[in-house]
Every structure is written in C-alpha cells, then in structure tokens.
Amino acid sequence: MPREYPLERTRNIGIMAHIDAGKTTTTERILFYTGKVHKMGEVHDGAATMDWMVQEQERGITITSAATTCFWKNHRINIIDTPGHVDFTVEVERSLRVLDGAVAIFCAVGGVEPQSETVWRQADKYGVPRIAYVNKMDRMGANFFEVVRQIKERLGANPVPIQLPIGNEDTFQGVIDLIENKAIIYTDDLGTQLAEAEIPAEMLDLVAEYREKVMEAAAEADEELMLKYLDGEELTPEEIRAGLRKATIAVKVVPVLCGSSFKNKGVQPLLDAIVYYLPSPVDIPAVRGINPETGDEDFRKASDSEPFAALAFKIMADPYVGKLTFFRVYSGVLKAGSYVLNSTKGKKERIGRLLRMHANHREEIDEVCSGDIAAAVGLKDTHTGDTICDEKHPIVLESMEFPEPVINVAIEPKTKQDQEKMSIALQRLAEEDPTFKMWTDQETGQTIIAGMGELHLEIIVDRLMREFKVEANVGKPQVAYKETVRGTAKAEGKYIRQTGGRGQYGHVWIEIEPLEPGKGYEFVNKIVGGVIPKEYIPAVDAGVREALESGVLAGYPVIDVRVTLFDGSFHEVDSSEMAFKIAGSMAAKQAVLKANPVLLEPIMKVEVVVPEEYMGEVIGDLNSRRGRIEGMEARNNMQVVRGYVPLAEMFGYATDLRSKTQGRGTYTMHFSHYEEVPKNLADQIIQKRQGK
C-alpha cells in the first residue's frame, strides 16, 4: 500500500510547557483547526480532548501523553501532548525521546517558569529542535518582549521572533508576520476569519528592526543567503523560511510566535510554523543502536526500505482493548498480525492490531511506516524503552534513563477481596510508569508504593479506586532514604553446613568500594584459576544484591557501590548456588559495616515565588528546614527564591507557605540528588528503624 504522506511531509512533535501556560487549550485548538474536533473543548469545562483520563479532567492538568494525529496543508502532524507538572518528568522525558521537534509554550504573563527550565534542559539533552509560542497575550500583564528576553537569558537559547503582537492585554487583536511583512487581524471569535491589513504606522520602526534580525538569522544558516544579505539585497519570504528551517533544525535558533489560544488568535500561523520550521523524520540523523549479536554499533535511517525498528515509549491499560503499547517507528514497515523481536528482552512477540490514536478515539490501520507513531495491541512482554525490530536484523536502540522514586507510602487494601485486585492493579500501573515502584516491606509485610512526588502517588491511588475498583488505606508519605559507603573494605562470607547427608558449602571474599553518585551498583568478577566455578558467580552477585537491597544500617537500599569478588573456595559435592548466594549475602553485610556506611537523603531543588514583603520570613523558614539558598531574583513584582532543601523537611510545606504569605506564595520542587544525612539526624533515624 503506498504511503498517504511522504516522510518529508510528516512531523512528530511534542508540546511542552509549564503548568497553566495553556498547553492543552492550544492542542485542542490545533485539533479544531485541522478539522479533527468539531466543537472545541475547554480545560475549565473538563471537556478537552487530549485530557482523557477522569483525573485529568477534574484537576485540569495533563498527566498521560496522548498521541494524536492531525493534518494541515498536506502534512501529517503527530502530536504528543506532554504533562507540565514536575511529578511527571518521566512522561516528558519519554516523549522527547521519540519526537523530532517541539513547540514550547510560554505564558505571556508568567514567562519562563522553573518547570519550563526543567523541560527545556531535557529537550537540550536530546537535541530537539524547537519553536516557541507565547500564549495568553490577551491577559493582564502580558509582555511578549520580556518573555523573549527570558528565553534568551534563562534558557540560554537564541530566540528569533518571526511575529510581533498588535496590541496587548485586552487590546490584543492580531500579529505582524515579519517574514511576509504584513499584519494579520482576527475578525471573528472563532479565529477562522483572518484579515490582512497594513502595518500600523507607530510600529513600522520596530517591525523594520525585528525583520532585520529574522533575515540575519536566516542568512547565517546558509552561505548563498549570507552573500545575498551582505550585498544588501532583500531576501524573499521563501528564502527566509528555508534559512530559518536550517537554523532551527540545527538547534541554532528558536523562532518565536505569539497568540491567545483561548481567544483563538494565532493558532493557524503556529500550525504553519510547525510545517515550515520543524524537522521531518528525514531531517534528523539516523538513529543509533547496538547489534545484540555482535555488540557493534549500528544505525537505522528513516526509510521504508530499511529493516523494521521501533521504540516502545508508553504502555497504557485501555478499558476496551487491553494493553496498548505506543511506539515510534524509526525505519521499515510493520504490518498488523506480523511477528517482531523484542531485542531488549530477546523475546519474539506478535503484533495483534495496529491503531492510530486520536486523543480519545482510535482508528484501526493495516500497517505503519517509518517515521510514524502508532499503538499496538497484543504485545505481552514489551515495556517502556524496549526496542521492537525485524528478527532477521536485530538492533537495540538506546533506551531511556528514568530517575529513582524519592517518596514512599504504605498502602493497605480495605478488605481481603481487594488484596489480590490491588497487587494486579499495582503491577499494571508499574508497567505503565517506570518511575512508579512497588514492593513488600520484609519486616512489616506492608505493600509500599513509591513515586516522584505527593501528587504522583495521589493520582496512582486515585486510579486504583476508579479504574480497578480497589479501596485502600494510605499511610503517611515517607522519605526514600538510601545507604552507601565512604570507605573501602574486604570481607569474608562462609556458609558451611556439613552434618550428615548432602551438605552446603559456599565461601567468598569480596571487596566493597564507593562509586560516584548516581552510578548505582556494579559487580566485578576477579576470580582466576577457577577457585569458584563459573556457574556459581551469578549466585554470589544475586546474594550481594539481595543484602544491599535490604540495607545494613537502617534497612534502606545501599547504592553507588562497586563489589569485587576476588577469592573464595568451593567443595566438589556440597557447593550449590544456594550456598554461594548466602555466602555472598553474608560477606556483603560485613563489608558494608566495615566500609564506613552512611545514610543518604533525597535533596529537592525548590523554587518559591513570593511577594517582596514576605521574603525574609520565607528565607528564614527555608533555612530552618536545613535549606541552602542558591539565589534570588525579581520577577514581575514578585521575588523568586531558589535553593536546595531535604525532602524530609518539605512535607506539608504547601500549607505553611500559604499561611506565611496569606495564600500569595507558590512553590515548585523536584528531585535533584542524594546527599549524606547529618550525623545526629542519621543516628535518630537508625535508632527509630531498629526500634530502640
């Protein structure tokens, strides 16, 4: 079957923004103008198409990134809507990995908020080309030029406005297109009636100045244009667009547009800009991977004739069709009903049906081609970050890294019947979300769930009740402490039982040493000459792992250590995997105790926005919470305080801040890193855990 849309006319884009910058409304308008939605949904009616989980409609925030296809001027645009709340950074990270370009939405009043910085850095990490859209130009306090300045200074980007607003706040009536050098006025409420007009006389100088900047940015990307520009010749709109496209795809400039999505102004030019400036799958470099059979680096170009390779980036439980696996095809073609290899797990899987998603309804399709985003039904073992590919040409694409959860709560089902339902439901939610973890506490037998923040866990508990009908009691949030070692130590583990019949014999010597933060756990086998047979080595590793998982000081997992197995002995008859696992576990506990173990706690990056008069009190309060103030700046009549504070001190902060600032202060925080707990506090925590 021939392609409906050639690759060059495909755009895979994400929409990224701070909470409340108007992301879902903008997406909704895009779907309206591209003809996919016949009546626009408003977020504050709880009817927006992209927000299709009940929790999202109630809270007016977007949690899951729904992937939607729409069409504009003979191009297919796949939009991935990403959440803006810090607790959901995993969703953003996950979608940026499979996008080719992004639209960053900023609020004309709030400008670059802390969350925008986080998301922007994530996009930098993946080298995603972006265009910026300054929304809410009709709001009190809207200031387009201030937002452009902040994009340059706070995000370190190179913003190039390709539009200027006509009017401001309630007089905002349209935009000036700097490329075509004309004014566009919106004449009706739906924003479908556009009238071209003369540029207002009082804006001519400003327009000339900014048009010059646009031409310069376009010329810098292309030598021919540069020569023409330096000769003082006027560049044509087509030439300017071609130059800007090159510069945007090379992540050298960020074209900036403006509008008011809620008032339906500025959305069609934004769609044009997506088509003009953001890359198609052909414009980005071939995707890198590893051939699992040879271990060599391999590449896949965006082409239907290459072998099939795709990355699963989201799993969702759908009430009607079961488990949906969203994936991005990097190369080749996949037909419904065919077999693929999950090269990450080395398992063969069958694709049942293929679906193209529109925010809340789905269309069944026969095949997907390179560059497309679709959902598959029938994949049993494929999780987020797995590669699926043609089994004759295996490749493992670079996966994604997800942060470890920082906050735990105990959860108990209200009735016996709920017990089984709860564990199935939690299992399913953990499949969907790699930053959500669950386990059973060995000492208390309680089920513990862990996530990236209080809101994250609230929504998980909410989904348990609604989707899986599980009633549960939830404990108080606890901090996810960790342990590590500061020194190096050797220890012996000997497990010998030889009393009649088959005995047990496992004997190991290990050395433990600290790794730099964030490196996790590393196991090195330095056994030579077969003092421990090869088949027992994995058992030693498993035993060490188990001991480190359950902690030594206070029962918290030990992280960032390297364990080296360097000696030991075995018995021809009595040795077994079990014996070596126990010996490994015994040695690990001893080694940690000898190597100066310490307790670590999660440190959060906190940003508090308060009116000037509450500044002193807020800083004093953060200091009393063991906070380190990093810096302060003024922003729109408010003061912004930035710092790092231990998570343990931040519980209930929202309420305290409200009462200290009479409801006018706001804050955001997200996980930054782990740090050693001060000795006096560590001793208290350890004693409490040991029940002294």
UniProtKB/Swiss-Prot annotation:
Residues binding GTP, per UniProt: 17-24, 81-85, 135-138
Alphabetical list of Pfam families matching this protein: EFG_C, EFG_III, EFG_IV, GTP_EFTU, GTP_EFTU_D2
Gene Ontology biological-process annotations: ribosome disassembly
GO CC field: cytoplasm
Entries under InterPro entries matching the protein: EFG_II (IPR041095), EFG_III (IPR009022), EFG_III/V (IPR035647), EFG_IV (IPR047872), EFG_V (IPR035649), EFG_V-like (IPR000640), EFTu-like_2 (IPR004161), G_TR_CS (IPR031157)
Keyword terms: Cytoplasm, Elongation factor, GTP-binding, Nucleotide-binding, Protein biosynthesis
Gene3D superfamilies named in the record: 3.30.230.10, 3.30.70.240, Elongation Factor G (Translational Gtpase), domain 3, P-loop containing nucleotide triphosphate hydrolases, Translation factors
Subcellular location: Cytoplasm
GO MF annotations in UniProt: GTP binding; GTPase activity; translation elongation factor activity
PANTHER family on file: RIBOSOME-RELEASING FACTOR 2, MITOCHONDRIAL, TRANSLATION ELONGATION FACTOR G-RELATED
UniProt record similarity statement: Belongs to the TRAFAC class translation factor GTPase superfamily. Classic translation factor GTPase family. EF-G/EF-2 subfamily.
Protein name, as recorded: Elongation factor G
Native source species: Carboxydothermus hydrogenoformans (strain ATCC BAA-161 / DSM 6008 / Z-2901)
Name of the gene this protein is made from: fusA
